[in-house]
Amino acid sequence: MVKKKEKEKVIFVTGKRKTAIARAKIVPGVGRIFINKKPIELWGNEPLRLWLREPLILAGDLAKQVDISINVKSGGIVGQTEAARQAIARGLVEFSKNEELRNLYMQYDRNLLVYDPRRNEPHHSASGKGASKRGSRRHKQRSKR
């Protein structure tokens, strides 16, 4: 008579910002957070770490009941931080199935749960009129006189 081990609750979520993609795995635990297999204390600089901890602070005790492992790739450090932040918030809402937490996140910052579709405009070819290679809408300045 061998007791069957209860299946552990595991949640997989993603977060995106600009070109950065964060995949998070959330399991019951003691509040450890790893980004690319390194503790959160080693991530970026202090303002980025504080920004990353916002969903955890808003969640309160729930953040101390889960371990979060995040894998982030592409984009820059700020985009990666925002993607990881979104993945943490989505994962905590899905893990707790708490509508109040979801509403709290939506009131605090909608981008914690909702994808931001804004993108950089691609460069247009230099089609006459002095179009520059510096930007998609930049043109050579013309004098009126």
State the predicted function of each range.
Residues 4-12, 16, 22-27, 31-73, ...:
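Structured, basic alpha/beta domains of bacterial-type, RNA-associated proteins
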Residues 78-85:
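Beta-rich strand-turn-strand
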